[in-house]
A protein has these predicted regions:
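Preference for bulky hydrophobic residues occupying beta-strand positions
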Residues: 8-12, 30, 60, 76, ...
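A generic structural signal for short beta-strands and their flanking turns/coil linkers
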Residues: 4-8, 36, 49, 54-58, ...
């Protein structure tokens, strides 16, 4: 498994399951969002809902299905930082085995314009320390 600096567990809910008994493909993006929320809380010490981050990119590659009774974890890392962008790479695991790989890019939006704003220096420090 690749080296990821953060990991969190997610619960498979009944509503996540499709007619084939697998976690629905769209739910994987929800698991990524839950991992981002946990990362912001645990690493950056801020609630994701209190930031002006906007998801601008999502890439998701499925490797194997997740079943209703699987233990699911999401590992993530920040490969590099942009001026205002925060890319994240993920591995969703079911019972320790890769179920999907993903990448997202969040941008810190400037609420006073249609543009972006630089990532806070405190975020940069915490992210670099976590690597």
């Amino acid at each position: 498994m690749a080296d990821y600096s953060y990991e969190t567990t997610v619960d498979v809910r009944l509503r996540d399951i499709d007619f084939m008994g697998h976690v629905n493909n769209a739910t994987y993006a929800t698991y990524l969002e839950q991992a981002r929320e946990a990362y912001f809380r645990d690493v950056l010490d801020v609630s994701l809902t209190e930031t002006n981050t906007v998801l601008v990119s999502l890439e998701l590659e499925y490797a194997s299905p997740i079943e209703a009774d699987d233990a699911v974890t999401v590992a993530l890392r920040v490969p590099e930082l942009g001026d205002s962008s925060l890319p994240m790479e993920y591995e969703i695991r079911a019972n320790g085995e890769r179920a999907a790989m993903a990448r997202t890019v969040q941008v810190l939006a400037d609420p006073d314009s249609d543009g972006s704003q630089p990532l806070p220096s405190e975020w940069r420090r915490r992210i670099e320390r976590r690597k």
